[in-house]
Amino acid sequence: TGVPYLREAYHGELQRERWGLVPVAQLDSYKGLYFATFDPEAPSLRAYLGEMAWYLDTFFDRREGGVEIIGGIHKWIIPCNWKFPAENFAGDGYHVHWSHLSAVETGSGGDFRVKPDNAGRALALGRGHSIMTVGPDMVADPPSPEVLAYEAQILPEMRRRLGPRLDLGTPIAGTVFPNFSMLRPTSRTIRVWHPRGPEETEVWAWVFADKAAPPEVKRALRLSGARVFGPGGTFEQDDMDNWQGCTQTGRGVVARRHALNYEMGLGRERFAAEFGAVASDYRYSESNHRSFYRHWAELMAEGAGEGANSGLQGSIHA
């Protein structure tokens, strides 16, 4: 542990070996992503990820060499509860038509989100992990000529590496429970949502690209990430306004008296072996939201007695 003025201010008496960082109980990596836990009883990382591992591969291991970070890190603070952005990346494709319509109309984010797509699915992979997909025929990439040409070029390699499941749909966004998210369209971004209390979240965001991608593709992804999903990005501003508004509304006395409706697609999801997940019956569904909050409620209710998380089937209390 480095200590400025150790001799002058502490008179050399501070026992640095006792006051270092608290060590984590487990630390492991998957495809270049590092995960840690303070729980010595937690399952191994690979067991914790389960089927989610393959979906991470579609973002981070689709080409030989994996991915790399392009540029630096963006950090900013949003006055919202951390679960709002986590659930947004987990399964909320429904809001795009109105929240981001102005950005879509400028052409900065692509128009695939507002096109009919009966093949897309919301996939709940257990332990609160979630993925959104679009149909395999949908273009789900930043509207950049360099990126679109590159994606068409590498598709055969991706199919060889990832297998036939890739032909069922294209993963576009997701959340590894609790607070790690990734996004493919409009940019390539990964996020960590750091709670700073119940009403504030610190965002750490990076843009990534395949290591094997040519420089012009990496540049296009970096610019798209800044324009669309940077702290001042067109899509990001819309989302932050929504999350902040939801958090502020949830503070109210009246809001706390009423349940929030999370019934979209309720009872129509099913386990789909081909996806290795509980899949919605349509592209838009709140099945992933329910899975996310169900797992969160179970963790919060541990030791609180039976029935502590009852009533969560189709509604969530503020």
For each feature predicted by the language model, list its residue ranges.
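Short, solvent-exposed loop/turn and secondary-structure capping segments
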Residues: 1-3, 47-48
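Short Fe-S-cluster ligation motifs
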Residues: 2-34
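C-terminal catalytic domain of Rieske-type non-heme iron oxygenases
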Residues: 25-318
